[in-house]
Structure formats: structure tokens, C-alpha cells
Regions:
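N-terminal pre-transmembrane cytosolic regions of membrane proteins
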Residues: 1-176, 433-440, 456, 505-508
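Serine/threonine-rich low-complexity intrinsically disordered regions
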Residues: 19, 159, 281-284, 345, ...
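Acidic, low-complexity intrinsically disordered regions
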Residues: 27, 53, 79, 106, ...
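N-terminal juxtamembrane/topogenic regions of multi-pass membrane proteins
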Residues: 29-32, 39, 173-179, 183, ...
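Extended alpha-helical interaction modules
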Residues: 85-296
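Amphipathic alpha-helical coiled-coil segments and their boundaries
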Residues: 238, 247, 284-287, 291-294, ...
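Membrane-associated alpha-helical segments
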Residues: 304-419
């Protein structure tokens, strides 16, 4: 039924951006193991490239790369069959392609070839999360074969013997759906194609079975392995753009739901509106402080909205380009095919994902505008409320200072002498200075209630005033001695600090 079973592999790595170092490391390791594990120790003649990339691994994917049709390097295993590997450049992606096509006398089928390729992958680092984190866009395993009967054409219909043979011999992904044999399609070249991959939309690895007619060896090679110019074949280009699409879906899914971000922003907006619901904005100090904190929280979420919104637009454009490239390569399938199968699934995913990203970006931009407008309005409201509070404090402070100055001026003009004993005068002067200091610190506290250090300064000023008043009282009472003075001053400082703390706590509860 089947002959010339072979395994083709295309590994796509993104060698630009943050993943460049990891992607180059994966490519270099897999390329080296193609030699040590698969025996590909010789260069491929008449390709114009060596067995290693010219200029080393750090030289690509720059614009100065030489080679034929993007070919960077090629290697092969000497002996019967075709055991070759090729490195190709496709813009910012490097494709490592491998063909394991043993000679008939080697007696190797898909199962044995699949196991040999699995041995090439880095031990312990072949998991999907690990490869994704190192810049691998996707991997495609192509199980290729031709019919043994001359003149027969492959047909993927369920009632044909071909489907039973393919099902028995294919090393399908363990997570592939049970109904995969019924999803085969025929492409315009006449090949029968099945996908035996896992059903996850964001899957890293894809597995395709491609069966050609007995006389289509050249056509199958050009479609799945390499062109006459050593370039990436049609199916390889299609799988590259499909891998870009599914990689973007993986990144989008890993970023979490944008709906939760919008919900958090809406909750912050609602809280801010409630805090500033009074006709003239927040009035009391505690209300002003809570509204200010709510505004800061909203501004922090606004930055997250900007980041997610712009990234959604960029991703939507990337998906749009990938979908256009998939369509340019033959509509829902490379070369055209009847509806259904893996290629129609790619096309449907691109359409759905593009619409989803466009909707997400629209909703995010609406939430961002709401956040900006409410935040700007609230900021103005808080500034006016703070300004009114500052004006009130300034008016009270000006009145108090004016009253003191008027009293001092009247005393001086009337030549009135305050009857204070000599020992009391220094203490009285100190008390007046401490009172002036405390008043200024209270003003600072009112202006910046959210700063803890202002409360500390007010406590220190109250302690200083308490100590000065205690000194004044002891001097007026005729208590002498430095020890008594220090004791009284300490007691007064403690009393002043206690009063300041009580007043501060009551203000906080309000």
C-alpha cells in the first residue's frame, strides 16, 4: 500500500528581539546533534554554502547573509538514502529543515524515523513551554510516503484502504483527537493530507501525513522539502505563517484576560466617582486623602491599559499579515484543497483571532478614554478642593499671626511692659517660638495629610511646646535647679506628644 516512507521536519525559530539568544542556542544545539545523532557529517555539494553558517551563529538573520535563496548552511549523511538538514533564512525567522528518507533496503518506517528525530531534540528541553520560552515559533513533522501501486491516486475517504494503512502506521500525537483519520483532504497537487496533531489551537508542534501517487516523488519533494533553488517549499512557507499565527495566540493567552483588566479599571473609576460625588468635590481631610489615593490607583491602571491596548493593536496587525500570507499561498490550503482539514482550520482560526483582537482593542481603547477623562476631571476637582483647603488654612493662619502682631504693636505703642519676672522671660520667649513653630507644622500637616513625616513633625512641635510651657510654669512657680527643669520639660514634652497623638487619631477616624 505505502512505500518510500520518509520524515520531514521544519523548525521555525524567531532570532530577533528578546528571544534571540535562546533561539540561537536551540538552533545551534539541534544543528550539532544532526551530526552527532543522525550522522550528518558532510556538507551538501553544489549548494554554495558550507556545513556551518558563514560568520557564525551570531551573524544572522542580518542582511549580509550569503547563500542561495536564503540558504545559510546544509549538511548530509553519506551513504544510501537522503539524510539531509538545511538552515534557511526567512526575514527574522530561521528555519531548520531536516529530511530523513532512508533507502528501501534500510527498512525504516515512520515510527523509527520519528524516534530518531525525537532523539535529536535537546534532552529535558523539548517541552512546549521550554521551546516557546526560547523563541521557537513552531515545529512541523511531515510523514511522507507514496503509494506502491502504479497509476493509483491517494484518496483520504474513510472507506478506502489507504486510511486504514495510514492510521496503523502513523505515530500520531498522543493528544490527537480520535477522529483524525476522518479529517483528511486532497490538495490540488493530488496529495492526500491528514493532520495528527493535538487539538489545542496554540499548539507548538504540528504533525501532518502526506501521501502522494507512486510517480509523484519530484512533486512531493518540491512541495514538502525543498525547491529546485534550495528554498523553503510551499508547504514549509505555509506552515511558517501558521506557526506565527499560533505563536501569537499563545502569547495572547499567556497574557491573561483583558476583561479582568477592564473590570479592574471600571471598579477604580466607580470608586473614584463615589469619592468625589459631593457637588464641590471632597471636603474633609480624610475624604480628600481617600480620593487622592483612588486617583493614584486609577492612574496606575491607566498605564496597564495603554500597554495592553497598544500590544493588542500590534498583535492584530501581525495576525492580519499572517492570514494574508496564508491566503496568498492558496486560500485555506497551500495549493488549494477541498474545504475542511488542517488548512481550513488555520484559516478559521486566523479569522476568529483577528476579530477577537480587534474587539479587544476597541474595548480597551474605550476603557482607556474613560479612564483618562475621569482621571483628568477628578485631578482638577482634587486640585480645586486642595486649593480651597489651603486658602482656608492660609486665612486662619494670617488672622492668627495678624492678631499677635497687632497685640505686640499695641503693647509697643502704648509702652506697656509685661510684668514678667526675670527667670520667666527666657521660658516665655521659648514658648512663643515653639507655638509659632507648631502652627507652621500644623499648616504643613493640613496641606500634606497623606505624608507620615508631617505627623511626626507635628508631634515634635507639640512636644517642644509642651516642654517650653512646663519650663515657663516652673519658672513662674519659683522652682529652681537644672534637674527639676529637665524633669518638668520632659513631662511637658510627653504631654504635648500625647495630645498631638490623640488629635491625630480622632482626625483619622473622621
Amino acid at each position: 500500500m505505502l512505500q518510500a516512507e520518509a520524515l520531514g521536519v521544519h523548525l521555525f525559530a524567531l532570532t530577533g528581539g528578546a528571544h534571540r539568544e535562546g533561539a540561537l542556542a536551540v538552533l545551534a544545539e539541534v544543528w550539532g546533534r544532526c551530526g552527532t545523532v543522525l550522522g550528518m557529517t558532510d556538507p551538501v555539494e553544489r549548494t554554495g554554502v558550507a556545513m556551518q553558517p558563514e560568520g557564525g551563529w551570531e551573524s544572522f538573520p542580518g542582511t549580509a547573509v550569503t547563500g542561495t535563496a536564503g540558504l545559510l548552511a546544509a549538511r548530509m549523511r553519506p551513504g544510501p538514502g537522503v539524510w539531509q538538514a538545511a538552515l534557511r533564512r526567512e526575514h527574522d525567522v530561521v528555519c531548520l529543515s531536516v529530511m530523513l528518507a532512508p533507502a528501501a533496503e534500510e527498512g525504516l518506517g515512520w515510527g523509527e524515523l520519528d524516534a530518531r528525530w525525537s532523539a535529536v531534540l535537546p534532552a529535558g528541553q523539548a517541552t512546549e513551554e521550554c521551546l516557546r520560552g526560547r523563541g521557537v515559533l513552531g515545529v512541523a513533522r511531515l510523514y511522507l510516503a507514496r503509494l506502491a501501486e502504479p497509476g493509483a491516486r491517494p484518496a483520504p475517504e474513510p472507506d478506502r484502504p489507504l486510511m486504514a494503512a495510514v492510521r496503523a502506521r502513523t505515530p500520531a500525537d498522543p493528544a490527537a483527537p480520535d477522529g483524525w483519520p476522518y479529517g483528511g483532504v486532497t490538495v490540488s497537487q493530488g496529495f492526500a493530507v491528514w493532520e495528527v496533531s493535538a487539538a489545542r489551537d496554540a499548539r507548538l508542534e504540528r504533525r501532518l501525513v502526506v501521501v502522494a501517487a507512486e510517480d509523484q516523488d519530484r512533486e512531493l519533494t518540491a512541495w514538502a522539502w525543498t525547491t529546485r533553488a534550495r528554498g523553503l517549499p510551499l508547504l514549509g512557507k505555509y506552515l511558517l505563517h501558521a506557526a506565527r499565527l499560533r505563536y501569537q495566540l499563545y502569547v495572547w493567552s499567556a497574557a491573561g484576560s483583558a476583561g479582568r483588566l477592564r473590570d479592574a479599571v471600571d471598579a477604580a473609576v466607580t470608586e473614584l466617582l463615589e469619592r468625589t460625588a459631593a457637588p464641590y468635590g471632597p471636603g474633609r481631610e480624610a475624604d480628600l486623602l481617600r480620593a487622592t489615593r483612588a486617583l493614584v490607583g486609577l492612574q496606575a491602571r491607566e498605564r496597564g491599559l495603554v500597554d495592553r491596548s497598544t500590544r493588542s493593536r500590534e498583535m492584530a496587525r501581525t495576525v492580519e499579515i499572517a492570514a494574508a500570507n496564508l491566503a496568498a499561498l492558496g486560500g485555506p490550503s497551500p495549493g488549494g484543497a477541498r474545504p475542511g482539514g488542517p488548512f481550513a482550520d488555520d484559516h478559521a482560526l486566523a479569522e476568529w483571532f483577528g476579530r477577537r483582537l480587534d474587539d479587544e482593542a476597541t474595548y480597551l481603547e474605550a476603557a482607556l478614554r474613560r479612564c483618562e477623562q475621569v482621571g483628568a476631571f477628578t485631578d482638577q476637582l482634587l486640585q480645586r478642593a486642595g486649593q480651597r483647603r489651603q486658602e482656608t488654612v492660609n486665612l486662619g493662619l494670617t488672622g492668627a499671626v495678624g492678631a499677635v502682631l497687632m497685640s505686640l504693636t499695641a503693647i509697643q505703642s502704648l509702652q506697656y511692659t509685661v510684668p514678667l519676672p526675670g527667670p520667666v522671660k527666657p521660658a516665655a520667649v521659648t514658648s512663643l517660638g515653639a507655638l509659632a513653630l507648631l502652627v507652621s507644622l500644623v499648616v504643613l500637616r493640613v496641606v500634606s495629610p497623606e505624608r507620615r513625616w508631617t505627623a511626626v513633625l507635628v508631634g515634635a512641635g507639640a512636644a517642644a511646646l509642651g516642654a517650653a510651657l512646663a519650663w515657663t510654669a516652673m519658672s513662674a512657680a519659683g522652682v529652681a535647679g537644672a534637674g527639676w527643669t529637665w524633669t518638668g520639660g520632659g513631662t511637658g514634652a510627653a504631654a504635648g506628644l500625647t495630645v498631638a497623638g490623640v488629635v491625630s487619631r480622632r482626625g483619622g477616624r473622621r
